[in-house]
Amino acid sequence: MQIYLVGGAVRDSLLNIDVKDKDWVVVGSTPTHMNSLGYQSVGQDFPVFLHPRTKEEYALARTERKSGQGYKGFTCYAEADVTLEEDLLRRDLTINAIAQSDKGLLIDPYHGQEDLKNRLLRHVSNAFVEDPLRVLRVARFAARFHYLGFTIAPETMQLMKTLVSSGELSHLTPERVWQEWEKSLSSKHPNIFLSVLKECGALAVVLPEIDALFGVPQPEQWHPEIDTGMHTLMVSQQASLLSTSLPIRFAAQVHDLGKGITPESEWPSHKMHCHTGIKVIKNLCKRVRVPNEYKELALLVCEHHTNVHRASELRAQTFIKIFDKMDLWRKPERLESILLCCQADHAGRLGLELNPYPQKERMESAFNAAQHVEVKEVVAAGFKGPEIRDELTKRRIEAVKVALLIN
């Protein structure tokens, strides 16, 4: 029995990235033997065990043979005669197919170290096309390692296109699509995840609502980049520079989905996209099973981002109406997230990335002024029942007028 450190832990160590999780592969053992050593069996599809002390995952070396459709359509063989090289051969990318012995010796039969040096994401074997999930994984790795200069090997991109055209991606479950998408949001370049999926054709299959934005024009006066899809990628990147919040980064990517269903006869104008986008976002979130925290922020940004952009023109009563709709009196922390998304939208335009965004400060000033008007003061003044709400709104409007010097 021999044990090797494998996968991401070896890769990240070689890239001088902090190793968070360690995965191990066990060669020359059986489930019975592992159980006798105190390891806890947890694998359903193949033999995986938790170490009795560290609780790290130890998987028996295995081979996989395609036996059906989708990423679960495999038959696994995990007997004691499976070699380390055979186990590494089934992995997706060469940089993930490097093992390390207990003495620190690297076993690298598929030249992963060379690809790490050359900053290449390359498939291990042509069996890559048997697993549709690998398209999303490669896109995620491209996003994660973009800051290090990694690119996808041309022959691997070609296999990704082959996988897409085979129809295999239709067998991906919504949970797996969201799992990879959400992981990509935590990278330094979430936009690369979408652009890679667009390049290989997968975006139209797994996230057609975002794919529909490409080729849709916007007014050049406001959007020098013109293409809505390109704008979305730019906004995504700006959001990642402004915040590490995953809901903010998600909302930035979907805030303009309404533009994807604007009738061509109305192009390049999209006057109703803040309203039409609501249903598109709801349907997307339902299909891919996006958590409510993400969905709620995305809907708020979709509905209100054009109003925020017009903050310098808004009347005091309009500010209060917007704050009411955002439910800020109960959830004031929402405002910062919404405004950061709007700032990313403003900056996500070709040549305008560094333009100031005074609208954010104006919205904050208006809300801070309105928030200082307290209900107890209205009640103490003798107002009762429905009068309280009316007077509270009236006082909030006056507070905004004073704060923003609005007549």
Swiss-Prot record:
Q: Which Pfam families match?
A: HD, PolyA_pol, PolyA_pol_RNAbd
Listed binding positions for ATP are 8, 11, 91, 137, 140
- For this protein, the Enzyme Commission number is 2.7.7.72, 3.1.3.-, 3.1.4.-
Any single GO molecular-function term of the entry would be: phosphatase activity
Alphabetical list of Gene3D superfamilies matching this protein: Beta Polymerase, domain 2, cca-adding enzyme, domain 2
Identify the NCBIfam families for this entry: PRK10885.1 (NF008137)
Q: What is this protein called?
A: Multifunctional CCA protein
State the encoding gene.
cca
